[in-house]
Amino acid sequence: MTRSLVIGGSGYVGRELVRQLAAREGDEVHLLGRSQPAGDLPATWIEADITQRESLRAALAGREYDVIYHLASLPGDTGDPLQMVTVNLVGLTHALEIARDMPGLQRFVLSSSISAYEWYPATKFRAPAYQPVDEEHPTRPEDMYSVTKRAQELIALTFWHQDRLPVTVLRLTAVIGPEGSGGGRSWRAFARMLAEGKRVEIPFFSMEEICHYIDLRDAARMHVVAAEHPGAPGQIFNCCGAESTSGMEFAAALQRLRPGIEVVTGFPWSMAQGDVIEFDMRKARDLLDFVPEYGIGDTLAHVLAWVEGGGLERTPDPEEEVSDTGVEAE
């Protein structure tokens, strides 16, 4: 039996991770957050705020875990630098301190972002130094979200170097899936357009643009693989789909699912902003034996099935949710 703590389990990837962990026979899953998560998540909820060091320690006193997954971060730049640092950096450090003092802990998995390299939709796109972008690519963050994500990585890996805390870092690209909470909240608007079935805006600024996405299910599964593989500690891995996708390919996949739907560019954000960006997943394949399972067609079919199954009506709107830190978690 594996005992797992998911910090940020009420967010977008966190909810899917909780579901996957809970589906494993005999595993015990706890979810830590400030407010009880909306919906029916199969995990024991622990009330705590990661930004409050002593109350966090008190909430976890006497508890032992095999794995801690840390997904509790602000899902974008809030415009409040102190809040960004308090949640993303101070909150993470509190969790790392507790993990360091937990004798039976076997892995601490940090959910980071490709924004640690620099790319963030609200910042003007700058082409990579080379492509596909691997984990050795220079990091050049210039906005508070990207800077705090890179700083998270450095802080977490310092605990690995100094204290031998078995930390693994995953750099997630844009994650596509149903529900659309936290870092995936924009996908709920996309799902609404799919539900209407007339016109849908896709997250590209042009049909020629090339971006790299990952299915929500693959993103969660890679967290589990990173928690279990002996070669993962001390490493950073890209967490992306097997292949990049152009606007034309994205549109064609949608039209196969929804014949006759009008597909246009102009979604509120785009990863490459009309340019091209591709990531390299060879390190995850070679060191972790991890290969993403779902292509863009599979992912969009999954979102559509959720919509047609009443997902929009069943799932709380993210605007009404409160996450682990008082704001939406990733």
Please name every model-derived segment:
Residues 150, 163-165, 176-189, 216-217, ...:
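Glycine/proline-rich active-site loop of Rossmann-fold NAD(P)-dependent oxidoreductases
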Residues 47-87:
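NAD(P)H-binding glycine-rich loop region in Rossmannoid oxidoreductase-like domains
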Residues 94-143:
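Conserved Rossmann-fold NAD(P)-dependent oxidoreductase catalytic core, especially the SDR/UDP-sugar
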Residues 222-270, 314-315, 320, 326-330:
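Mid/C-terminal beta-alpha module of Rossmann-like enzyme folds, strongest
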Residues 123, 157-210, 254:
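NAD(P)-dependent short-chain dehydrogenase/reductase
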